[in-house]
Amino acid sequence: MGIKGLMKLLQEEAPSCIKEVEKMSALAGHAVAIDASMALYQFLIAIRSADGGGPSQALTNADGEVTSHLQGMFSRTIRMMENGLKPVYVFDGKPPVMKSGELAKRSDRRQEAQKALEEATEKGNAEDIDRFNKRLVRATPQHNEDCKELLRLMGVPHITAPCEAEASCAALAKGGRVYAAGTEDMDALTFGVPVLYRRLTVSPAKKIPILEIRLERALQELEMTHEQFVDLCILCGCDYCDSIRGVGPKKAYAGIKEHKSIENFLEVLQKNKSKGVVIPDEWLGENPIYKNAREMFIKPEVVDAKETEIKWRDPQETELVDFLVKKHGFQEDRVLSAITRLKKSKSTQSQKRLDSFFTVMPSANGAKKRKAPAAKGGKKAATAKKGKK
């Protein structure tokens, strides 16, 4: 889920923290920790085929095994490396106990989608079948293992986080091992990543720019410390606890900006008995849940940035061909062509970063505030939220 409404809030209240990167090559030379679970979900959703105008299905080999995740990981990783990026994939570890409630909700939503899919199939509505099929997509442990093996053979480093992938992405960036994190999850900022890239793994056919979001600039414009920003994110709505009914991102922002903490803001809400505001019982008492959520963001379980090995190696060509062609049914000529591109990309990775490709978001509210435009392509351009873990 990430943080509800945070992107829109930043576009309105801290627009200068967001930049559009029109060309991926502008990021050349940077190592980026990529949320692998999010990327896998994107590939499973986006890389599909439709026969005869019917509903789309994930790509499969002759044995009926899904290969969308491998196709996406292979092609998009090579594209990043050809543009000079140095990707480091970070996979999810065990889900935190506090996320059990959110995971249960996702399970319920999948059950609802399954029922809706059955009804749509009965009616033969291809559009609805496609829509509900995508809601049922999730990356399996086997998908993860397939991609880890693929990355190993490509010579691309990958890490399995002890817990949340985006938290370890942030830790690697804060520890100076990578420049930024690449994920659609806005809670990477809550975990403290200095620079966040969104849309890195989106298909180039969509022709939408990468978004760069800088945390320090966001905090400056919001006039908040990172601790206050964490409280804001919890109030907006996160994976670790239910939010307060009647308190959306704007009210949360105003509340934290004025009262500096959730504790102080809650005291005011209770005192004023604000209309339409319902504070969950778990937010009250001696051990309110928001304190545990705060701890999850400020002291997450992450990889040791200093001790983690990150090394890019030469691809193992023969083994890579065997894995993709013989085991997973890829076309050999295409795989060989892609391997040639992969090998050539090694020289590109040392290319200097080209700041001239950056485009500052346009002004909206004069000198004080510059409002960022809505995402191109509307909802279809925005990357779907994962059904991970």
UniProtKB/Swiss-Prot annotation:
Binding-site residues, DNA: 48, 76, 164, 237, 239
Protein EC: 3.1.-.-
Domain of life: Eukaryota
Gene Ontology CC: mitochondrion; nucleolus; nucleoplasm
SUPFAM superfamilies the UniProt entry points to: 5' to 3' exonuclease, C-terminal subdomain, PIN domain-like
Subcellular location, record wording: Nucleus, Nucleolus; Nucleus, Nucleoplasm; Mitochondrion
Family to which this protein belongs: Belongs to the XPG/RAD2 endonuclease family. FEN1 subfamily.
The protein's name in its UniProt record: Flap endonuclease 1
